[in-house]
Amino acid sequence: MPRCNNRAPAQMRPVRIIRHYVRHAEGSVLIEYGETRVICTASVIEKVPPFLKGAGQGWLTAEYGMLPRSTGERMQREAAKGKQSGRTMEIQRLIGRALRSILDLEKLGERTIQMDCDVIQADGGTRTASITGAFVALYDAIDYLRAERMISQNPIRDHVAAVSVGILKGQPLLDLDYLEDSGCDTDLNVVMTGSLGLVEVQGTAEKVVFSRQELDVMLNMAQQGLQELFDVQRKALETVA
C-alpha cells in the first residue's frame, strides 16, 4: 500500500534535531520525526530522591506530556483533570529506563537529571522521538556538568534511540505515522543502544497475531532505522554549540 510522501516500507520519515532550543535548560532539543515534533529538555538538580541519599550515585527521571492542541482535536490538560493518564505514566517511565540504560549513575554524582519531553505536534511516534531527542539533550547537560567541573568523567556509555515498526495489511512498515499506527495489525516500539543492544521491545498484536518470523523481520527493520537515528544524533552533536 502507498505511504504518505511515497515512503518505502523500510524508510524513515525525515528526522531533524535542533540543539539548544530552550534558553534556560542545561540541555534541550527540538526533534522532528516527520510531522511529529517534541521539545526535550534536561535539567540538572543538585539533589537525589530520598531512596538514594548517601548512596554515592545520581539519578535520572523523566516526565512526558502533550500540548492540548498537539492533536487534531484539543485534549484537556492532564493538570486540569487532576491526574496523569496511564499512557502518560507508561511513556515517561519508558523514557527514564531508556536513558538510564546508557548512564553510569555513580559518575553522575549525587544529583538528578530531570528530563522533560513535551509533544507540541503529534503524528505518531511521540514516545520514540522523545527518547531519541532526550538523549541529545542529556548529552548537552552532561557537557555542561563537565565544563563547570562538577563531574570529572563522562557518565554516558553509549547512544540510545527508539523507533516504531508495525504490520499494516500484511506489510511490515518502519516509523509509523498516526494513520498507520491507528490502523496497523501489529505495533512494535524498539529501543536500542548505539552498540545494538536491545533496551526495550514493546509489541502488541492489535487485530491479527504475528509470527516469530514476522517479529524478526520487524526487529531487523527497526535496527536499520535505529542506525540511521544514531547517525542523526552524531551529526547533531557535531554542530557548533
Swiss-Prot record:
Keywords: Nucleotidyltransferase, RNA-binding, rRNA processing, Transferase, tRNA processing, tRNA-binding. Phosphate binds at residues 87, 125-127. Coiled coil: none annotated. One of its GO terms (molecular function) is tRNA nucleotidyltransferase activity. Its EC number is 2.7.7.56. GO terms for biological process: rRNA catabolic process; rRNA processing; tRNA processing. It is an enzyme of class 2 (transferase). It catalyses: tRNA(n+1) + phosphate = tRNA(n) + a ribonucleoside 5'-diphosphate. CDD domains: RNase_PH_bact. The keyword Nucleus does not apply. PROSITE patterns: RIBONUCLEASE_PH. The keyword tRNA processing applies. Homohexameric ring arranged as a trimer of dimers. Belongs to the RNase PH family. Phosphorolytic 3'-5' exoribonuclease that plays an important role in tRNA 3'-end maturation. Removes nucleotide residues following the 3'-CCA terminus of tRNAs; can also add nucleotides to the ends of RNA molecules by using nucleoside diphosphates as substrates, but this may not be physiologically important. Probably plays a role in initiation of 16S rRNA degradation (leading to ribosome degradation) during starvation. This is Ribonuclease PH. It comes from Nitrosomonas europaea (strain ATCC 19718 / CIP 103999 / KCTC 2705 / NBRC 14298). The gene is rph.
